[in-house]
């Protein structure tokens, strides 16, 4: 079993830096597109055998050191009572805007409401046995609430910000409910066999550090503290958090996910030796010639300066039009250049 990823999460020394990619099971792989051509995105998420198949593809094709469950962060939100569709981005036809809307939301039972997610994890633990660890994941409460209130993607998330400022009681009630749902969902993933959990707060960085601390931090902290994580490391990734790492760090967790807007060495200095880090190559680097990819991999590794507790990753998801051979070259570079 390749335990480099889990060892790095706990800050233990490893013989070479582990690497995986956010969205590594995805559209840039022809093998993924072959599966996806037979079903809709939601059908793929809700069919355990297919979700497991595409989860394993990048492990075999790229040689990454961890698999991450193929799913969507909004999967557990639908059974709360919202109608979800992808056209092509996520859209809720009945967004949450009032206290009455919040009161109608239910806390799903993961075993009953999203059994396909847990079944995919169980299949994957069998199929990945002796290979690499499996990462489960979920959206952070704030990012989930962004979609639930806005009803779709947004550039500025003005609707949820307006709720935060103008209807703080509605916002607090919603965040409380989403946090409880998230806790149940992620603990169910751990019970099913997920060996690490990544919490994605894709939109946490749209807030000022002051607003993040007031409106987001209490809920993410509650979520992380509520996970049964004695042997299950938690990676906390807040996109755009480079300017507020000391605040984000207060939420807890074992690994801080970093995007590419901060020097990895500077981030480690801010976070201190107790917290591992994950990141942080700019995803567009994978369009570059191999010599440039190698140079950039070397730069990120040099910024870490050999400190234990580094998982190499992109600073966000791999882009759909990246040549797969460039992703494979990057993984090989990380392994070759970090060999101890």
Curated annotation (Swiss-Prot):
TM helices/strands, residue ranges? none
Gene3D superfamilies in alphabetical order: 3.20.20.210
User: Its GO biological process terms?
Assistant: protoporphyrinogen IX biosynthetic process from glutamate
For the keyword Lyase, the answer is yes
Q: Which UniProt keywords apply?
A: Cytoplasm, Decarboxylase, Lyase, Porphyrin biosynthesis
Annotated Gene Ontology cellular component terms: cytosol
Q: In which pathway does it act?
A: Porphyrin-containing compound metabolism; protoporphyrin-IX biosynthesis; coproporphyrinogen-III from 5-aminolevulinate: step 4/4
Q: List the InterPro entries hit by this protein, alphabetically.
A: UROD/MetE-like_sf, Uroporphyrinogen_deCO2ase_HemE, Uroporphyrinogen_deCOase
Query: Which EC numbers characterise this protein's activity in its record?
Result: 4.1.1.37
Q: Where in the cell is it found?
A: Cytoplasm
Q: Where does substrate bind?
A: 23-27, 72, 147, 202, 316
Q: Per its UniProt entry, which superkingdom is the organism in?
A: Bacteria
Per the UniProt record, the site (Transition state stabilizer) maps to 72
SUPFAM superfamilies with a match to the protein in the record: UROD/MetE-like
Q: Which family does it belong to?
A: Belongs to the uroporphyrinogen decarboxylase family.
Share what the entry says about its subunit structure, partners included: Homodimer.
State what this protein does. Answer: Catalyzes the decarboxylation of four acetate groups of uroporphyrinogen-III to yield coproporphyrinogen-III.
Q: What is this protein called?
A: Uroporphyrinogen decarboxylase
Q: Which organism is it from?
A: Trichlorobacter lovleyi (strain ATCC BAA-1151 / DSM 17278 / SZ)
**Chain's gene name:** hemE
């Amino acid at each position: 079993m390749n335990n480099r990823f889990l060892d790095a999460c706990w800050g233990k020394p490893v013989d070479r830096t582990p690497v995986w990619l956010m969205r590594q099971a995805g559209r840039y792989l022809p093998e993924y597109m072959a599966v996806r051509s037979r079903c809709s995105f939601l059908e793929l998420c809700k069919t355990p055998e297919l979700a497991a198949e595409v989860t394993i593809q990048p492990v075999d094709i790229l040689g990454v050191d961890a698999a991450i469950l193929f799913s969507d962060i909004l999967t557990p939100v639908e059974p709360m009572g919202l109608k979800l569709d992808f056209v092509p981005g996520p859209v809720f036809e009945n967004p949450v805007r009032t206290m009455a809307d919040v009161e109608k939301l239910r806390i799903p039972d993961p075993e009953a409401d999203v059994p396909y997610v847990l079944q995919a994890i169980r299949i994957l633990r069998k199929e990945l046995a002796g290979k690499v660890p499996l990462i489960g994941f979920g959206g952070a409460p704030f990012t989930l609430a962004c979609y639930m209130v806005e009803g779709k993607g947004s550039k500025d998330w003005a609707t949820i910000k307006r709720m935060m400022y103008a209807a703080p009681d509605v916002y607090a009630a919603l965040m409380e409910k989403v946090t409880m749902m998230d806790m149940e969902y992620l603990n169910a993933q751990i019970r099913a066999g997920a060996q690490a959990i990544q919490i994605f707060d894709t939109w946490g960085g749209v807030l000022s550090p002051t607003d993040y601390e007031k409106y987001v931090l209490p809920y993410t902290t509650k979520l992380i503290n509520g996970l049964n994580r004695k042997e299950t490391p938690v990676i906390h990734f807040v996109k755009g958090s480079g300017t507020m790492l000391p605040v984000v760090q207060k939420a807890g967790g074992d690994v801080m996910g970093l995007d590419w807007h901060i020097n990895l060495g500077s981030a480690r200095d801010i976070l201190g030796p107790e917290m591992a880090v994950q990141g942080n190559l700019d995803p567009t680097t994978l369009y570059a010639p191999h010599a440039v990819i190698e140079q950039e991999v070397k730069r990120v590794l040099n910024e870490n300066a050999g400190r234990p507790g580094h998982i190499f990753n992109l600073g966000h998801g791999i882009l759909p039009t990246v040549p797969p051979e460039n992703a494979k070259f990057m993984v090989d570079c990380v392994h070759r250049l970090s060999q101890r």
